[in-house]
């Protein structure tokens, strides 16, 4: 994706579900006005979920997800069906595609039950409908809004776009990343280490998003490396309102920054933005109970190239061993992979999830809670290990109560 484009994690995720040859790929091409998806009469053309980042009016920036048919057969087919079902965990709006010449069957209704169980907004779209169709009876049977469209002639495609736009969740009351922590005219200092793990020639996504959030709030953002932090603070005429740092230099930054200046990290901001900061604060207490052999799952939302000083696979495990004095067994997941059975783990430590949308991160937290496994966040864990958790939560008075 273009680095100037809306991040995929910030786009409305629209999942297209249905049986093989129901017309899912043709519908995607019609909605987007482009030949993005391969269309064939051969069943099972789409073998894995395919993601298409688009700008579609009146929806705005979206991520269209074309999924394998839910009626795929055989051992490999069952794996494809499972992948299609997993897409529900990151879907904001679902489209159930039904061939109008066949009508819905038990597989369609079973999938619809899964969708409604997750409380997702959904439209049942009957494809291959060249003439007007009365779907009143189907709406009664399925219990959801139904629309008849033709991907060939474009019939009702514009109306479908409008209907989808009406289902977009209201963002007015959603959690801000950083804008609610500053006032217009405030100064914020961002501490960004440039080490071997840092991408060449650019800032990573969390840093970009925090800078934009500060600018949108009318604040001034200063960006510095940890090595230049002291000189940066000395150059400012007044103390900054807040310091936001990379978690891996928490210890140094906490010693350098005056105690009357708010301090937190990019990772903690994202735990509040996409996850559940209260749950992360509760979960981190498990660190003091870790013993030899306890399994700890470290999970990341992206699949970046591992460096010799990688935070997830090298630094964090080393800090945990030193803090606990124990030898736990670490396991890792990355990208879209996330263990279904979490009961074997003593705790889970998750990254800030800048590459995951809120829906998927909330699903992971829910899985951990439902299975009774404490889950926390990189930034929270590192602050806890450094003995500065209370200080890093000062910007969030409601969260501080969890430490009482």
PLM region spans:
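C-terminal effector/interaction modules appended to NTPase cores
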Residues: 1, 11, 19-25, 201-404
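Conserved G1/Walker A P-loop phosphate-binding module
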Residues: 1-78, 86-89
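Short, flexible loop segments at the rims of nucleotide/cofactor-binding pockets, characterized by
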Residues: 41, 70-76, 99-103, 167-169, ...
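Conserved C-terminal guanine-recognition region of P-loop GTPase G domains, centered on the G4
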Residues: 52-60, 79-147, 177-180, 203-219, ...
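G-domain G4 guanine-recognition motif of GTPases
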Residues: 67, 98-102, 120-136, 147-156, ...
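Canonical P-loop GTPase G-domain recognition
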Residues: 120-180, 187-189, 218-227, 264-265, ...
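Long, well-ordered amphipathic alpha-helical subdomains in the mid-to-C-terminal portions
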Residues: 181-209
């Amino acid at each position: 994706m273009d680095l100037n484009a809306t991040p995929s994690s910030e786009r409305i995720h629209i999942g297209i579900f249905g049986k093989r040859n129901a017309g899912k790929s043709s519908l995607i091409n019609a909605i987007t006005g482009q030949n993005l998806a391969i269309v064939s009469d051969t069943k099972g053309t789409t073998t894995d979920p395919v993601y298409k980042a688009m700008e579609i009016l009146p929806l705005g920036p979206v991520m269209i997800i074309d999924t394998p048919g839910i009626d795929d057969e055989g051992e490999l087919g069952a794996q494809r069906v499972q992948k299609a079902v997993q897409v529900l965990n990151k879907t904001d709006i679902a489209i159930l595609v039904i061939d109008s010449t066949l009508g819905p069957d038990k597989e369609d209704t079973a999938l619809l039950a899964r969708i409604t169980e997750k409380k997702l907004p959904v439209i049942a779209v009957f494809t291959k409908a060249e003439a007007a169709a009365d779907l009143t009876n189907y709406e009664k049977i399925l219990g959801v809004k139904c629309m008849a469209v033709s991907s060939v002639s474009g019939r009702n495609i514009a109306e479908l776009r409008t209907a989808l736009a009406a289902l977009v969740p209201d963002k007015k009351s959603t959690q801000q990343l950083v804008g609610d922590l500053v006032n217009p005219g405030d100064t914020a200092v961002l501490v960004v280490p440039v080490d071997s793990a840092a991408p060449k020639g650019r800032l990573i996504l969390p840093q970009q998003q925090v800078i934009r959030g500060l600018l949108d709030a009318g604040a001034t953002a200063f960006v510095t490396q940890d090595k230049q932090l002291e000189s940066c603070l000395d150059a400012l005429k007044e103390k900054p309102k807040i310091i936001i740092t990379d978690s891996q230099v928490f210890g140094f930054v906490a010693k350098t920054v005056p105690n009357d200046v708010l301090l937190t990290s990019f990772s903690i901001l994202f735990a509040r933005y996409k996850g559940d900061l209260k749950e992360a604060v509760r979960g981190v207490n498990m660190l003091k109970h870790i013993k030899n052999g306890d399994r700890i799952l470290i999970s990341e939302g992206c699949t970046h190239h591992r460096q010799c000083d990688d935070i997830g696979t090298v630094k964090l495990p080393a800090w945990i061993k030193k803090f606990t004095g124990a030898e736990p067994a670490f396991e890792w997941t990355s990208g879209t992979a996330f263990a279904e059975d979490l009961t074997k783990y003593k705790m889970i430590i998750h990254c800030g999830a800048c590459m995951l949308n809120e829906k998927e991160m909330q699903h992971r937290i829910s899985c951990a809670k439902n299975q009774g496994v404490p889950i926390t966040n990189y930034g929270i864990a590192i602050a806890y290990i450094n003995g500065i958790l209370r200080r890093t939560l000062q910007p969030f008075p409601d969260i501080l109560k969890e430490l009482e």
